[in-house]
Design a protein with these regions (language model features):
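A short, exposed loop/beta-hairpin motif centered on an aromatic-Gly-Thr core
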Residues: 44-58
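Short N-terminal "domain-start" leader segments
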Residues: 1-34
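Short acidic, gly/pro-rich beta-turn/loop elements at beta-sheet edges
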Residues: 37, 47, 75
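A generic structural motif
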Residues: 38-42
Length: 76
């Protein structure tokens, strides 16, 4: 098992912790949802971003900050 963080974990530590715990993320267009990026936990949708981003990098940065803000707001 790898013990040192990889490139993704360095760039997006909150997303990495989120999906390694019990949450998951969705990235991409979905006919039933307007947001391009979304964060979920077992209770349902906890955060969603905008409909469009200039780049995937932009979407991931917003997702990183969105999950971090949600965690702080809910005292997790």
């Amino acid at each position: 098992m790898k013990t040192t963080p990889g490139i993704f974990e360095h760039a997006y530590p909150t997303i990495a912790r989120w999906v390694q715990a019990s949450g998951w993320v969705e990235i991409g267009a979905d006919e039933s949802r307007s947001a391009f990026v979304r964060a979920w936990d077992p209770g349902g949708l906890v955060w969603e971003g905008e409909q469009h981003y200039a780049t995937i990098e932009d979407a991931l940065q917003v997702l990183e900050h969105g999950i971090r803000a949600w965690i702080a707001e809910h005292g997790l």
